[in-house]
Structure formats: structure tokens, C-alpha cells
Amino acid sequence: MKGMILAAGKGTRIKPISYAIPKPMVPILGKPVMESMIQLFAKHGIDKIVINTSHLAEIIENYFGDGHHFNVQLSYSYEATEVNGKFVSQALGSAGGMRKVQDFSGFFDETFVVVCGDAWIDLDLKKAVEHHKSHGGLATIITREVPSSEVSKYGVVVTDKYEQVVSFQEKPLESEALSNKINTGIYIFEPAIFDFIPKDVEFDIGSDLFPLLVERKAHFYAVNMDFQWLDVGKVKDVWEVTSDILNGKVKGYPIPGTQLAPGVWVGINTQIDISKCKITPPVIISSGCEVQDGATIIGPAVVGANCKVDAKSLVSNTLICDYIHLANDAYIVNKTMFGDYLLGHDGYTQLLADCLYVHILKNRNVSRPLMGRSSINDIYSTLAPKANPVPLQQVK
């Protein structure tokens, strides 16, 4: 079976993380969120997959390659325009990206599944496809029920008694919502869908294609299913998803490392004596770390790979990226460290280079685009004025 993963967006809502990596490469416990989606496809027999790319496309292509490590075949559709002999990234919209693939090779010659690359799900895709085929429809959107108090966060799908889609509401007020079923970004199509998608123009599935299907009264259905869905569309989602996994709110997500004590996981080649540290679970200390005696780590917390945590430092309710040295007197609470940034859970952003007691290990010779520094430091220099270093104790 065939599928497509949408990965061409600029990741505007997840800046500054997306300055360094595309949104589908955001790591959850060290693994890109899109890797889990590819593994789910493989599990359910979807082994021929096209990924559309644009923003920082090379990071995605270099990581996943041809897909053989995941027992699938991967191909990439790069969306760009040529300017003065050079390609400049230019996404075509989710439906436009589908049309580009179809015009190029006729790839979609059977029922196919399309998903967004920035979410983790445990949906039974085989069952979803069976529901789609039972309706005999042209398109099916997979929905999920949320509490009425949460509908204002999502796109709401309204159906008739036959499950045919009749309208959409974009983030309605609770009092105005006509349904509590939300769009999860999981779609099933027949090849005839391309009769509704124009060629060589930007065209979006949600805002362009679906309203057109409703207007023309096409056979367009919604199937409501019960499954876990973790979206990392915004900066705060990265920490919230990580925290939920550590706190046991997510079933089935693999936690890396060996559990040395209840709620304390430690990776290989790590130097730590948990009896001599002050550790309050749940905590993950990744591979290759050095945690000195006396260090305090209060969960939920994740220490990335190859980090050093000195004896008099404290970490609480925090996600730390790879290759970070927390010197004595570092006091990091309610933060996410990512690339060159210290991101507060309240939206505060600061360059790590401007923080005392935090050192980025610059002399590493690795090629990991996930959680360490990127190769685009020239961009960072334009993002914030130079300032005197601020002790982390003073960071809000």
C-alpha cells in the first residue's frame, strides 16, 4: 500500500526550533516525531512512501535515506522554485504537494493514506482504511473526539447521520461548536481526488480541498476513531508531550535506556551513581552523560545525550538538548534547551550563549541534526542583540 507524509512546512509556529530543523524532525525522547509515523506505516503494510519536503529538506533526506532501515521504500518530492540558477524552497500546500507527485509519476494509483509529519499516533491504519472502503467514498478524514472544553484549540468536523462531512469550524468557541470531533491530519483518498486539485498552484487540503468537496457534495466522509494523538505543532507542545510520556499519560511510547530505579532511566556509557545524586522521578538521563555526585535532577526531566551535569547544579521540569555542560550553580527550572536556545515554558526565549553556567560543547565531531547545534549559526547572530551574560538564576 502507498502513503504520503507531509513535511514541507516552514514550522512557523515552532520557531526558533525550526530555524535549525524542520518540524517533523523535532525529537521526542531522542527520536524524530516523523520516524514514529514511518514505523507506523510499516507496521500496517504501507511500505511505499513519498515525503514532500521544502524547508531544510536535506536534514530529512539525510536522516531517513531510502527507508531500508525502516523496511519501507522512501522517495522525496522537493518543493522549490528556481531563481537565478538556484533552487529556493517554496511549498505548494499539502494538496498541491500531492498533485506535484501525481503529475510527476502517477504514484497514487490505488487507495492511499496521507498524514502530517509532526504528530505521533497509535492509530490502527488498516482498520481506518477498511472504514474508508466500506463507505465507497472518494475521501475520508479520521477524526477524534475531544472534551467540549477543548474544541476551541482545533479544527472541528461536522457530519450528518451517515458520517458524510457537511461543514468545518476552525477553532470555534465551545458555545458555538457543532461537534466535538476534530481533524487529526490523517486522510485516506482515492486517485480520483486529483480531479479536484488544480495543477501548479498552492492548494491546501484543509482550507481549499475539503471545502471544495463539501461544496460539490462529493463522497467525503469522516470516521471517528479512538486512538492516542500527540501533536508537536508548537514550541510548548514539545515539552508537554515529553512530560506526558514521562508521567505515564501516554501508553506504548518506548522510553529509552535502562530503568535503574522506579521512574529513572539511564542510557548506556553514562557515568552516574544515582545513590549519590538527588533524583526525583520521572527522569531520563541519556547515553554518554556524566552526572557528578550531588547533582539535583527533579522530574519530569530529560538530560540529552553526551551532557555533563556538575555537582552543584539543579535541573527541574526541564528538557535539555544533547552536548550541554551544566556547570556548578546552574539552576534550570521549567525550561526547554534546544539547539542554541533556552526556551521557557511560559514563552520566554534566550540564547544559550548569553547564559552563565551553561556551556555548549562546541568541539564535538558529530552529525546529529536532532538536538545539538545546527550548521546555521550565521542565522542565530541576527536573531537577538548581544547582551551581557545573565545568570540562570535570574532567567524568568
Regions found by a protein language model. Give the residues of each.
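Conserved N-terminal catalytic core of the sugar/cofactor nucleotidyltransferase
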Residues: 2-5, 29-116, 125-127, 159, ...
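A short, conserved acidic/glycine-rich loop-to-beta-strand motif
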Residues: 135-145
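Catalytic-core segments of class I nucleotidyltransferases/pyrophosphorylases
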Residues: 111-113, 120, 126-133, 146-149, ...
